[in-house]
Curated annotation (Swiss-Prot):
The gene is prmA. GO terms for cellular component: cytoplasm. InterPro entries: Ribosomal_L11_MeTrfase_PrmA, Ribosomal_PrmA_MeTrfase, SAM-dependent_MTases_sf. Belongs to the methyltransferase superfamily. PrmA family. It is found in: Cytoplasm. This is Ribosomal protein L11 methyltransferase. SUPFAM superfamilies: S-adenosyl-L-methionine-dependent methyltransferases (SSF53335). It comes from Streptococcus pyogenes serotype M12 (strain MGAS2096). GO terms for molecular function: protein-lysine N-methyltransferase activity. Keywords: Cytoplasm, Methyltransferase, S-adenosyl-L-methionine, Transferase. Methylates ribosomal protein L11. Pfam families: PrmA. Gene3D superfamilies: Vaccinia Virus protein VP39. Its EC number is 2.1.1.-.
Amino acid sequence: METWQEVTVHVHRDAQEAVSHVLIETGSQGVAIADSADYIGQKDRFGELYPDVEQSDMIAITAYYPSSTNLADVIATINEQLAELASFGLQVGQVTVDSQELAEEDWADNWKKYYEPARITHDLTIVPSWTDYDASAGEKVIKLDPGMAFGTGTHPTTKMSLFALEQVLRGGETVIDVGTGSGVLSIASSLLGAKTIYAYDLDDVAVRVAQENIDLNQGTDNIHVAAGDLLKGVSQEADVIVANILADILVLLTDDAYRLVKKEGYLILSGIISEKLDMVLETAFSAGFFLETHMVQGEWNALVFKKTDDISGVIGG
């Protein structure tokens, strides 16, 4: 029987996606996220009984490594990278790292138990790929395999990106998804009526994972996934460009985004911590965009910009 090594990192909720990425980069074969907010949000939804869970801003991210992995080296690297994230201004909280060994079937049971279907927006619900789910009339279901470690789509930055897509897509658009990760924003765009979606990620693992998640969802063969460094070398114009990545990276793509977004089109930027907000706004305004919508959840911000000559109801530019 193959055995696995489990490493659990306790961090602030705002660091969920960044820390998950760190764990995958150190060789984890999957992650599971335990968040008290998920339990509290589910409580009383259908009258089920849930254990009492104390609300906390700290979450537990558990990563699974093959038995051959040198955990001492992995944990040292994790601690170094978490310290670096904190130096960038990301709130990571008081970090603790635990580890243990477990059998393969225990891993399969452990990481799946954390995930439940989650209604994210008015129309969109994210459902784990192994779950049978009966959608209501008009409900659009995104199937994801969270075991692939790019998150379940419930992080505030992803939620706000999905809200923004729901706000701007009317059907028939061309969408570019920069830093696609799990592919959730591309899948949502397809379900919301976009005609063609181009999804790019610098990470080859993300490209593979995104394609696997896309394949789980029917009617998404209009999504084209490829490796790419932001928007470098892209010539395809788009009605909507969406990027849910760190603010320091977002500012590197705004000029290219302005070049590619069609007139009256939109640029959706998410993944912005509050202290980086002004930097992103100034960069987008300098590129020529006008701000149409500003969303906030906790320390995270998402912005919807428009490329337009009609500046009524918009800000900046």
